[in-house]
Curated annotation (Swiss-Prot):
Its EC number is 7.1.2.2. Keywords: ATP-binding, Hydrogen ion transport, Ion transport, Nucleotide-binding, Translocase, Transport. Belongs to the ATPase alpha/beta chains family. It holds the Pfam family ATP-synt_VA_C. This is V-type proton ATPase catalytic subunit A.
């Protein structure tokens, strides 16, 4: 090997001199087989060829290693060198993650664009994930020299932006007695801010730590989740709730609105931080997120308006990027989410879409000549999905002070043709606890969010009962009644198609009208209007209460109006006499949350009382 070439190889960011090289024996798309790799480890990071392409070892046989390369492999030749790094694929964790956009292996795309001046990522580019030159305001906790620290202890705070405080924790595997802690001031992430001594050995720590992406970060214990993930979407919050620390799947055909729901969750949910992973989806969708999010603001409890981007991290791995990196992007995203969870934050991770990730697994599996299972996917597809979906949850964090955090995963699934029997969808549904099934027919009718209320479900309803009891003791009964009305409407639709609506009993006509109210004016929501883009939970509860109140009063009036001399109160009479109240029920969604909770609740209460009065007068008149 020429000396010049050897010198060039060691200039990438790992400054340690490497002594062991393998050489390329075979190239098949993103899969490379290298010989002379004795002593290499599974999932070890390697640099392949003259361009130092990033790769990861996924199979070992004797001294040959099979490597999946995360960049375009065109131009690789037999006998090209393969450089080992003796470490797994890891991410850098520290101040500077929020507001940034990375690719699937945590390379900062903004920095690469500035340095290369190109719209595409150059091959073999090596840029630190986090900026090493930026100075951060470091504020140590009330600890000093001689104090003991153990893994997970928070020892300082960095003011990352005006929205988020970044707590600096000791890496989980470290412990010892403090021999030095930096005074308050400005430091970069590579400056030493802490020194510990353990069994006579001193070790220095910076604000930067690395963590292998395939290894879950340790926690003290897992806890039962009991706080709802409030999304601002009525159909999700009221009928199919998730929890902070839950797992949700959004399967749906193309054009059903999966990405819009994912983005709405990122914008308006009650999470402290959001990791949005665009995995194998169109580049325009990530561009849309990059354009929209910086302009979106959220109102804090103290009245301040802050940009949503200040709590968001984007991992973009679009469909025109190398296939292998899709697999890494999901693990990169969940590791970043776990890092913020360990600070005591509630984090949401949006994976859009896990189907593309599974397709990447299928392609790599095919290149490895593994035995295919259903639809050509590998037999271990369900195991890989399960290992990803078991990483979220509500946890008690390691170290002190005592704190809890959570990671919630919302995974969009894109089954071909909207077929829910697809292997990825089937495997996902057997794992997740919340299923928000999107319906192509609803989307074609322009009913958004197009969540089908007949096939969707949530297994967290029981876990959240204590929260609902405190918030509003009537809510559980109201929700049960609303579900019954929607289910009854589905049963009646077949009869209506056969004999027509006029042949139905008066009570059934009321059921159909109430179900229409629920469908068109409660479950449907316009994400592009100021009054309906986000619906607070109190507004969702009051809207449903008034609709079900109308249903109960109308049924009661019909029953009381039925006598031996015929039906005095009919559905058409109700519609005629209380038409103005009916219009006010339809118009509830136009109430703007910006007016404040007290004003809105007052208006909803007045409508509730007016409904009772209107039906009482109707019954009195017809006696």
């Amino acid at each position: 090997m020429p000396a010049v070439y050897g010198a060039r190889l060691t200039t990438f960011e790992d400054s340690e001199k490497e002594s062991e090289y393998g050489y390329v024996r075979k190239v098949s798309g993103p899969v490379v087989v290298a010989d002379g790799m004795a002593g290499a480890a599974m999932y070890e990071l390697v640099r392949v060829g003259r361009d130092n392409l990033i790769g990861e070892i996924i199979r070992l046989e004797g001294d040959s290693a099979t490597i999946q390369v995360y960049e375009e492999t065109a131009g690789l030749m037999v006998n090209d060198p393969v450089l080992r790094t003796h470490k797994p694929l890891s991410v850098e964790l520290g101040p500077g993650i929020l507001g940034n956009i990375f690719d699937g292996i945590q390379r900062p795309l903004k920095t690469i664009a500035k340095r290369s001046g190109d719209v595409y990522i150059p091959r073999g580019v090596s840029v630190p994930a986090l900026d090493k030159d930026t100075l951060w305001e470091f504020q140590p906790k009330k600890i000093g020299e001689g104090d003991l620290l153990t893994g997970g202890d928070l020892y300082a705070t960095v003011f990352e932006n005006t929205l988020m405080q970044h707590h600096i924790a000791l890496p989980p595997d470290a412990m010892g007695k403090i021999t030095y802690i930096a005074p308050p001031g400005q430091y970069s992430i590579t400056d030493t801010v802490l020194e510990l001594e353990f069994q006579g050995v001193k070790k220095k720590f910076t604000m930067l730590q690395t963590w292998p992406v395939r290894t879950p970060r340790p926690v003290a214990s897992k806890l039962a989740a009991d706080t709802p993930l409030l999304t601002g979407q009525r159909v999700l919050d009221a009928l199919f709730p998730s929890v902070l620390g839950g797992t949700c799947a959004i399967p749906g055909a193309f054009g059903c609105g999966k990405t819009v729901i994912s983005q709405a969750l990122s914008k308006y949910s009650n999470s402290d931080a959001v990791v949005y992973v665009g995995c194998g989806e169109r580049g325009n969708e990530m561009a849309e997120v990059l354009m929209d999010f910086p302009q979106l603001t959220m109102t804090l409890p103290d009245g301040r308006e802050e940009s949503v981007m200040k709590r968001t991290t984007l991992v973009a791995n679009t469909s025109n990027m190398p296939v292998a990196a899709r697999e890494a992007s999901i693990y990169t995203g969940i590791t970043l989410a776990e890092y913020f969870r360990d600070m005591g934050y509630n984090v949401s991770m949006m994976a859009d879409s896990t189907s593309r990730w599974a397709e990447a697994l299928r392609e790599i599996s095919g290149r490895l000549a593994e035995m295919p299972a259903d639809s050509g996917y590998p037999a271990y597809l369900a195991a890989r999905l399960a290992s990803f979906y078991e990483r979220p949850g509500k946890v008690k964090c390691l170290g002190g002070p005592e704190r809890t955090g959570s990671v919630t995963i919302v995974g969009a699934v894109s089954p071909p043709g909207g077929d829910f029997s697809d292997p990825v969808t089937s495997a996902t549904l057997s794992i997740v606890q919340v299923f928000w099934g999107l319906d192509k027919k609803l989307a074609q009718r322009k009913h958004f969010p197009s969540v089908n209320w007949l096939i969707s479900y949530s297994k967290y309803s029981t876990a959240l009962e204590s929260f609902y009891e405190q918030f509003d003791p009537d809510f559980i009964n109201i929700r049960t009644k609303a579900r019954e009305v929607l289910q009854r409407e589905d049963d009646l639709n077949e009869i209506v198609q056969l004999v027509g609506k006029d042949a139905l009993a008066e009570g059934d006509k009321i059921t159909l009208e109430t179900a229409k109210l629920l469908r068109e004016d409660y479950l449907a929501q316009n994400a592009f209007t100021p009054y309906d883009k986000f619906c607070p939970f109190y507004k969702s509860v009051w809207m449903m209460r008034n609709i079900i109140h109308f249903y109960n009063l109308a049924n009661q009036a019909v029953e009381r109006g039925a006598g031996s001399d015929g039906q005095k109160i009919t559905y058409s009479l109700i519609k005629h006499r209380v038409g103005d109240l009916f219009y006010r029920l339809v118009s509830q969604k136009f109430e703007d949350p910006a007016e404040g909770e007290a004003a809105l609740v007052g208006q909803f209460q007045k409508l509730h009382e007016d409904l009772s009065t209107g039906f009482r007068n109707l019954e009195d008149e017809t006696r």
